[in-house]
Amino acid sequence: MKPIIAIVGRPNVGKSTLFNRLVGRRKAMVDDMPGVTRDRNYAEVNRFDVPFILVDTGGFEPETSDRLLQQMREQSRFAMDEADLILFVMDARGGLTPADRDVVDMLRRINKPVFYIINKVDGEKQEAEAGDFYSLGVDHIHTISAEHNRGVGDLMDEVLAAIPYDREKESDEEITRIAVVGRPNVGKSTLVNRLLGYERVVANPTAGTTRDAVDTRFTVNKKPYLLIDTAGIRRKGKTVQKVEKYSVMDALRSIERADVVLIVLNAEEGVTEQDSKIAGYAYEAGRGCIFVVNKWDTLAKDNSSIAKFTEEIRRNFKYLPFAPILFVSAETGQRTGKIIAEVDQVMEQYCKRVTTGELNRVFTQAVDENHAPLSAGRRVKFYFATQVAVKPPSFVVFTNCPEGIHFSYERYIMNRFREAFGFNGTPLKLIFRGRDKKDA
């Protein structure tokens, strides 16, 4: 396993700026609003051929009555428990605070390497003003400017020398990447916490509580998964604040990174236009899809309730007839145990390969039973089909008229492939191509 490095500290001391500096891309949101990174945010980093997992956290306030800040504090404690090494960040401009002293006292009791860092030291003036921090009595303090990359290289040289890493045990394991998407406050974070078995993501009744797309590795029956709890995707008109805009883009990027997308719907509100747009993002990205109807326990139901809601989903998501539907309650855990099993089945289909012989047997039979319509008065001829890719399964069909295939006939061929080979939960790509002489 890769070693884990956690970045902790009070709100707005520059943790996310340091995180982004080390990751090399803008992964955590950076804004002047305290508490902008509310959850733990993970990234895999490889620095000078030493791989590790870097964890950014929300601000750590030892004493607070604010419920959200209390939750962020608990997330920071979880991160410190998981970590092999801790980077504790303080703010040179804000000076040494009682909260900093409280955290240092707590870190002294942790039997792990801790690096004490004063951030926002942009020059000699700030270096001189940082003298108060040496009263903490720790062995060594590093002064850096994460924003201007001052002192970061020297810091990381020492960090890399201190982290435990056994290259012999490290392997590039296959991992299933799961994105959890949906409108704000449909219960995504509660669902993630239920799947993981502990409070990994801040769950709060306030819509938009999860701002960053947060990655978590976990295993079920020794099988590895990466779970991405995306920020809620709002309608464009509601994406007003700069931070909210970042979150929507982050959620869409999370779909791009995923293998399987859990599209979370709110049973209390039914299917909305925004749900359709979100599902459309996943479909257009070519990802495996599962509908998860959450808050099912809150509805008054009869024997036809599931059938009626299923019909509503199929009517509104006609482009996803292959996506399984699960009715769950993240709050109570009802049926959530079925989700990972369904993910495994969809992933199997998402990676499925069919031999050229099997494929052409089904394809030839389909064409014989239903000939393609004429194209500009020409008869459409098909030569053969072959699978060229997985994730999603993609096929090339060679024909004399690649531009003249009607979309309804394309859908017919894909339906015949599904009837023969399954492909439940995954989109298919079908490409019609003219036959070159070398293909003859």
UniProtKB/Swiss-Prot annotation:
Superkingdom in the source lineage: Bacteria
EngA-type G domain ranges (all copies): 3-167, 176-351
Annotated PROSITE patterns: G_ENGA
GO molecular function: GTP binding; ribosome binding
InterPro entries: G_ENGA, GTP-bd, GTPase_Der, KH_dom-like, KH_dom-like_a/b, P-loop_NTPase, Small_GTP-bd
Function description: GTPase that plays an essential role in the late steps of ribosome biogenesis.
Protein name as it appears in the record: GTPase Der
Source organism: Geobacter sp. (strain M21)
Gene: der
